[in-house]
């Protein structure tokens, strides 16, 4: 739909935006009976009637118009006098109050009101029992008879205010429509409409039955002397067109037929306020506390239909005898206690008065009463509004004479005010609301100009900016304002990687490119887009240095193509800098989309008075999509991307595709017939103007101008628009509606390159051409304009577009006045007069010549450092020898390097050089390797010094080795790294007969001599180092020897190797030996060979060459059959150590698998679990537990951490076992999200108050009862240590609190309050970037037992359990 399809008087912009005061209540629909108000002459409503069409709408200017159409003002009307202005207030329509058409009786007024039939029915006396309440409000408000002595006093109007006349139209304050010229204005006509008023604004005719008569008019204000005759029926006005009450009367007399428009603000301000001075209480007010019974009896007396009581919440009718519920102090009734409770919990929104529609600010003065035909409760701001609303509801509405005149909505079939008129084909649909308008568009499948965010209709105003456009997902989106555009972008923003450089960007900040296959790709910049296009074209070639900085290319590299030459760049900055300079000589243009340089004929786009140049058609199409180059196609009338602009009969038209161009040409040719031609010169399709015969061919032209210009070009007499030379012009282009000719492509490129920098001295560039006016575009004089406007003729096509363009007069093109003929030339015989001088213009084009010069930014010469060499000399200083108080020199020893020259011979010099060379060979360049070699030499020398003792304590006691130990700093912070490097240097994978249990025995005295120095260095454990660090700083100096001697004086069996690192060579060599021994005797028997399905499986010696299935079944067989070189069976912890080594070997060789958690290795995991389930830790004589598996081994082979959901679960179970002491699956299954909580507290330390974060576990009550039995149980429960895991501030990567918080973030939020689950099964298809890693299904018992058996084989588990509980810091 387009706004131009609406008739001018029913433009959607001119309709009211909000309901007027006294219109439909908020909770009442169109289907209910609506009663008008007759309380005061200051109010009037227009009954809903059929909205007139633009053609049938006439403005009633004079009473003569009323005589021609007397039915316009038929019906019961009422003349209201306000300030000297007389206008008609229409009577409300009738309401059927029964078959007899009863009348309302008023004791204060003897006037009878006729019923629907036009006859006066029988008078019904009032009910004497009603008391004061029996006085009906109608009587005081009915029109008075001419002979009635009772008159109504008009409200007082202040004199110092002025009358303001405005319109009450919706949302169109800026629109204005002028009256046609030449139409005289009647002296009795209404004043000129204000801005925003259109013809027919607010004029509705209400017709009644022919038999109805109109009551006489009330007199005007006293002193005016203006009375209206009963026969004169002024045109009715809506309630929204009243005059403001507080306005003084106009001095002049205004005819009663004048239309007085009143603004919406005036109508809102005219509600009666009891605080005003001129307020008159027209009738006694009914108390809002009136009982329901008296209220029902009064309404029953007025209407034959009884009122039904309904529930205030669910609107269910209450039956007679049913129990009703009511809250104290509130009048609402409810059918059940649930409705009462639900209604009370409703949020209290902004309440508005049912009558005046104003917000109720003071709830104390508000009145809630059950009134109206439906018997529902309504809230009013004051009792005055309640009385006025009851009077409005009690007055009968006369029925319209013709029910077909009522305007009904085409969607909901309700009668009411028309908000939209839609012309679909030949049918005009009238719609009452925006929701019906939306349903109509959805039912008809119409694509109207609506906002894609909020769905509101976008009204196109003249001179106002159009809608906000956005090209998204291949569609053009429209938005009514920038707020909706921002909300749409925020809602649909996604982050995508650039196809070329993989940079993450937001989709609305990226550039889209559609390839030949229709696939859309997103890029972060034009550099990446151009590089992708060059790569797709297959023009990259071999890698070369960067075309700008000559550096080697990095990945990814960037490309650009200029004149069949592909340039390569190392970075986007080089790509951009290269575009600023021309790679070669000649003229190059820059593409407006990809900013690449090219020297071919450009693709040109003329859009919004700007001309854009592109290197190819693809860039032009991408630019259209990016910038939203959208126009309405002249053929299909749809807004799509602009394809081409063509001229038809001098008018430029836009098209969306080539098919629409051909179809429009076909229709245009049929319309013009045989006279339709295509101009040979300007190529426009128009009517034949001139025909010319050239070389036996017939050429058609649209005008003489085109013919003359074509003949100049054909005869080679035209000049080039670039170099101004005559001759053969090969290039022709269309430039802003004109034809330009050029000598060759070089001149054409020069013309395009100077479009933004024209040289006005030598040639007329594009900008200068715009400044030069053609003879047709000269401004006309006012006299010519006036004459031409009187003869203006509009075509039907122009009349159809009046809604789209501003309303203004268009003058028909007239032929310019021919100039006077020049005087005849005087004939001359002089031959010199026949000579024509040859004029030539020389154009000077300045071009900046770019030079490149290399500069060195890095230092390439070695920096010369001046090293001062101090030489001691004796300088005599005179002194006073302490006889006077003068500064005395003070000697301070300063270490100064002084070169010493020792005398030597030639033989000793040669030996010194040889010694230096030997030291260079022995000492490696890596200092870490040098420390290891020094350590090995130190141990070797120690063994030679003392053959009897191999203990490290004897070595330390030796004074010669003490200095070497201190220099190596074996016991410093880098001790662990040095030992790990030493172990890895000793890893020899091809070493035969490597025995793990022989190298790592339970008894430290049986250490293998090949690795004994490694374990000797481990005699001082981390506990001893921590004890040393806890000592004061003054005592630590020189304590290294003391601590070492104390540790050596202990029993040699009190310690075992610690933190030796995982050596994967044991596992790999054991695998090779097992495979070799398995296939040593040839092929194995069929019963012993491994099978994967029907095919036999042969295990390979190289673990990396094995597939997942081979590794699974091979490891399972390896766990069952592996033995030591001496034939004995490995212990379970040793087998676990070998498997951890195999896992580390796979990871270090980029085989990213986890043989302990992946589902492919389930058979191996089950077999390993069988082996570990029977293992029990060995207790050494010093009451320590021995195990070859350490915690550090699990961190090295990535069995602890956050590498996968299973690894994270294994880490949590490891910490819970280590710190909580949970050693069975039942104890782990008692964990839940409610009894494992994160807490933070403040504790006091010698350094001050710090915040400590920990994880606490509150064991269930039944577990405590099972452990604590007998007397004193309560005391033991209170004194039981709290199980907690404290944060690791020294190493946050191994902090239990961090792992627990990360686990909670990956669990479903709905399970964080469960008290029966803690370990959850991971999702089957989840990646590291997934927001959730775990499902709602808990881990089964078998999987927990398998993980727990592997954890219980770690030595640190039992060391932590053997430590005494630390005191709580609370």
From Swiss-Prot:
From the record heading the sequence, give the disease linked to this protein.
Intellectual developmental disorder, X-linked 112: A neurodevelopmental disorder characterized by developmental delay, impaired intellectual development, language and motor delay, autism or autistic traits, and variable dysmorphic features.
Acidic residues bias: start-end ranges: 263-279
Protein name stated in the entry? Zinc finger MYM-type protein 3
Task: Cite the effect that the entry attributes to residue 932 to V.
Answer: In XLID112; uncertain significance
Its GO CC terms are: nucleoplasm; nucleus
Q: What is the effect of changing residue 441 to Q?
A: In XLID112; uncertain significance
What's the reported outcome of changing residue 398 to S?
In XLID112; uncertain significance
| Covalent cross-link site, Glycyl lysine isopeptide (Lys-Gly) (interchain with G-Cter in SUMO2) | 308, 320, 328, 778, 786, 804, 847, 861, 920, 1275
Q: Where is this region: Disordered?
A: 1-72, 90-301, 759-830
Q: In residue numbers, where are the MYM-type zinc fingers?
A: 332-366, 378-422, 429-464, 477-511, 521-559, 567-604, 612-646, 653-692, 699-733
Q: Which residues form the signal peptide?
A: none
Q: Which GO terms describe its molecular function?
A: DNA binding; zinc ion binding
Q: Which residues carry this modification: Phosphothreonine?
A: 795, 817, 826
**Positions of post-translational Phosphoserine modification:** 263, 267, 464
Q: Which InterPro entries match?
A: DUF3504, TRASH_dom, Znf_MYM, ZnF_MYMT-QRICH1
Q: What does this protein do?
A: Plays a role in the regulation of cell morphology and cytoskeletal organization.
- UniProt subcellular location: Nucleus
Ranges of compositional bias, category Basic and acidic residues: 230-253
Question: What spans are recorded as compositionally biased (Pro residues)?
Answer: 815-826
Organism in which the protein naturally occurs: Homo sapiens
Which tissues is it found in, per the record?
Most abundant in brain, moderate in muscle and heart, low in other tissues except placenta.
Bias-annotated ranges (Low complexity): 1-12, 52-61
* Superkingdom of this protein's organism: Eukaryota
């Amino acid at each position: 739909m387009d706004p131009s399809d609406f008739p001018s008087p029913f433009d959607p912009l001119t309709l009211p935006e909000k309901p007027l005061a006294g219109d439909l209540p908020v909770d009442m629909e169109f289907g209910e009976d609506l009663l008008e108000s007759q309380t005061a002459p200051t109010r009037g409503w227009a009954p809903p009637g059929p909205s007139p069409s633009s053609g049938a709408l006439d403005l009633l200017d004079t009473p003569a118009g009323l005589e021609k159409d007397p039915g316009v003002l038929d019906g019961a009307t009422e003349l209201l006098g306000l300030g000297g202005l007389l206008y008609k207030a229409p009577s409300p329509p009738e309401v059927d109050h029964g078959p007899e058409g009863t009348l309302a009786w008023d004791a204060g007024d003897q006037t009878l009101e006729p019923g629907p039939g036009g006859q006066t029915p029988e008078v019904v006396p009032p009910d004497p029992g009603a008391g004061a309440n029996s006085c009906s409000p109608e009587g005081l408000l009915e029109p008075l008879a001419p002979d009635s002595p009772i008159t109504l006093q008009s409200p007082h109007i202040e004199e110092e205010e002025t009358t303001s006349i405005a319109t009450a139209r919706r949302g169109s304050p800026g629109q204005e429509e002028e009256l046609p010229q030449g139409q005289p204005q009647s002296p009795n006509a209404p004043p000129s409409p204000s801005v925003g008023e259109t013809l027919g604004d607010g004029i509705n005719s209400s017709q009644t039955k022919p038999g109805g008569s109109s009551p006489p008019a009330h007199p005007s204000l006293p002193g005016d002397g203006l009375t209206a005759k009963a026969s004169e029926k002024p045109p009715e006005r809506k309630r929204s067109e009243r005059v403001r009450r507080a306005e003084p009367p106009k001095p002049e007399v205004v005819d009663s037929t004048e239309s007085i428009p009143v603004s919406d603000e005036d109508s809102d301000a005219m509600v009666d306020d009891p605080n005003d001075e001129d307020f008159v209480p027209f009738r006694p007010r009914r108390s809002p506390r009136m009982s329901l019974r008296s209220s029902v009896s009064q309404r029953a007396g007025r209407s034959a239909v009884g009122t039904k009581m309904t529930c205030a919440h669910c609107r269910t009718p209450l039956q007679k005898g049913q129990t009703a519920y009511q809250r104290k102090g509130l009048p609402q009734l409810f059918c059940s206690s649930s409705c009462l409770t639900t209604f009370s919990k409703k949020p209290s929104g902004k309440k508005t008065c049912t009558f005046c529609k104003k917000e109720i600010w003071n709830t104390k003065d508000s009145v809630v009463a059950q009134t109206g035909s439906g018997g529902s409760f309504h809230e009013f701001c004051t009792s005055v509004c309640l009385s006025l609303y009851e009077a409005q509801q009690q007055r009968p509405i006369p029925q319209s004479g013709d029910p077909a005149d009522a305007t009904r909505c085409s969607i909901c079939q309700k009668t009411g005010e028309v908000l939209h008129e839609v012309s679909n084909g030949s049918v005009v649909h009238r719609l009452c609301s925006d929701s019906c308008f939306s349903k109509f568009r959805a039912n008809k499948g119409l694509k109207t100009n609506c906002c894609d965010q909020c769905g509101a209709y976008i009204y196109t105003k003249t001179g106002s900016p159009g809608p906000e456009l956005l090209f998204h997902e291949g569609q053009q989106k429209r938005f009514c304002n920038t707020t909706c555009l921002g909300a749409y972008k925020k809602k649909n923003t996604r982050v995508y990687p650039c196809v070329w450089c993989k940079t993450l960007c937001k989709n609305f900040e990226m550039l889209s490119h559609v390839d030949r296959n229709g696939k859309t790709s997103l890029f972060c910049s034009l550099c990446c887009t151009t590089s992708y296009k060059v790569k797709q074209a297959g023009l990259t070639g071999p890698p070369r240095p960067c075309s700008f900085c000559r550096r080697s290319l990095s990945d990814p590299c960037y490309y650009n193509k200029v004149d069949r030459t592909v340039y390569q760049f190392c970075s986007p900055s080089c790509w951009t800098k290269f575009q600023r300079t021309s790679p070669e000589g000649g003229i190059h243009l820059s593409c407006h989309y990809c900013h690449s340089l090219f020297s071919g004929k450009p693709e040109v786009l003329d859009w919004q008075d700007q001309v854009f140049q592109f290197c190819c058609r693809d860039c032009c199409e991408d630019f259209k999509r990016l910038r939203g180059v959208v126009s309405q196609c002249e053929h299909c009338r749809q807004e799509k991307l602009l394809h081409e602009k063509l001229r038809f009969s001098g008018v430029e038209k836009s098209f969306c595709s080539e098919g629409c161009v051909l179809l429009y040409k076909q229709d245009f040719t049929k319309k013009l017939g045989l006279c339709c031609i295509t101009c040979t010169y300007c190529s426009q399709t128009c009517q034949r103007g001139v025909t010319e015969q050239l070389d036996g061919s017939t050429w058609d032209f649209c005008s003489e101008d085109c013919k003359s210009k074509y003949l100049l070009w054909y005869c080679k007499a035209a000049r080039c628009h670039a170099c101004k030379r005559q001759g053969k012009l090969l290039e022709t282009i269309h430039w802003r509606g004109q034809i330009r000719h050029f000598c060759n492509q070089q001149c054409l490129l020069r013309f395009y390159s100077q479009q933004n920098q024209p040289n006005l001295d030598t040639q007329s560039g594009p900008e200068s051409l715009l400044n030069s006016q053609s003879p047709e575009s000269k401004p006309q004089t006012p006299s010519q304009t006036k004459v031409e406007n009187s003869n203006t003729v509009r075509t039907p096509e122009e009349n159809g577009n009046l809604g789209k363009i501003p309303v203004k007069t268009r003058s028909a093109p007239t032929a310019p006045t021919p100039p006077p003929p020049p005087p005849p030339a005087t004939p001359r015989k002089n031959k010199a007069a026949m000579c024509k001088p040859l004029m030539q213009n020389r154009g000077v084009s300045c071009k900046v010549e770019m030079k490149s010069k290399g500069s060195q930014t890095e230092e390439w010469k070695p920096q010369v450092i001046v090293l001062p060499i101090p030489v001691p000399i004796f300088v005599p200083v005179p002194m006073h020898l302490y006889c006077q108080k003068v500064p005395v020199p003070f000697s301070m020893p300063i270490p100064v390097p002084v070169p010493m020259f020792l005398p030597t011979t030639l033989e000793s010099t040669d030996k010194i050089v040889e010694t230096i060379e030997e030291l260079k060979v022995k000492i490696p360049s890596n200092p870490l390797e040098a420390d290891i070699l020094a350590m090995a030499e130190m141990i070797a020398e120690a063994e030679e010094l003392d053959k009897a003792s191999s203990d490290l304590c004897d070595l330390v006691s030796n004074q010669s080795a003490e200095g070497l130990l201190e220099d190596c700093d074996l016991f410093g912070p880098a001790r662990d790294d040095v030992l790990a490097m030493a172990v890895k240097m000793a890893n020899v994978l091809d070493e035969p007969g490597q025995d793990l249990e022989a190298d790592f025995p339970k008894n430290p005295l049986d250490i293998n001599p090949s690795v004994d120095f490694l374990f000797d260095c481990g005699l001082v454990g981390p506990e001893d180092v921590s004890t040393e660090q806890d000592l004061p700083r003054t005592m630590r100096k020189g304590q290294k020897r003391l601590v070492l001697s104390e540790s050596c004086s202990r029993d040699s069996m009190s310690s075992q190797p610690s933190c030796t690192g995982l050596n994967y060579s044991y596992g790999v060599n054991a695998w090779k030996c097992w495979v070799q021994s398995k296939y040593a005797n040839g092929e194995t028997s069929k019963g012993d060979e491994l099978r994967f399905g029907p095919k036999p499986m042969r295990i390979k010696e190289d673990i990396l060459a094995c597939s997942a299935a081979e590794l699974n079944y091979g490891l399972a067989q390896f766990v069952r059959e592996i033995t030591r070189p001496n034939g004995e069976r490995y212990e379970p912890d040793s087998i676990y150590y070998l498997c951890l080594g195999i896992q580390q070997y796979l990871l270090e060789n980029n085989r990213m698998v986890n043989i302990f958690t992946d589902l492919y290795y389930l058979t191996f995991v089950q077999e390993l679990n069988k082996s570990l389930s029977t293992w029990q830790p060995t207790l050494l004589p010093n009451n320590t537990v021995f195990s070859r598996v350490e915690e550090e081994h699990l961190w090295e082979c990535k069995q602890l951490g956050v590498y996968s959901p299973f690894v994270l679960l294994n880490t949590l179970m490891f910490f819970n076992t280590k710190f909580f002491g949970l050693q069975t699956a039942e104890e782990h299954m008692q964990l839940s999200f409610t009894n494992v909580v994160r807490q933070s507290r403040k504790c006091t330390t010698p350094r001050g108050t710090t915040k400590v974060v920990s994880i606490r576990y509150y064991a269930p009550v039944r577990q405590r009862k099972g452990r604590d039995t007998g007397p004193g149980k309560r005391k033991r429960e209170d004194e039981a240590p709290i199980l907690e895991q404290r944060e690791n501030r020294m190493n946050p990567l191994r902090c239990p609190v961090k792992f627990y918080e990360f686990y909670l973030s990956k669990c479903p939020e709905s399970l964080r309050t469960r008290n029966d689950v803690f370990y959850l099964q991971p999702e089957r298809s989840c990646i590291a970037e997934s927001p959730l890693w775990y499902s709602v299904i808990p881990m089964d018992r078998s999987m927990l037992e398998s993980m727990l058996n592997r954890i219980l084989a770690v030595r640190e588990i039992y060391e932590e359990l053997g430590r005494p509980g630390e005191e709580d810091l609370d």
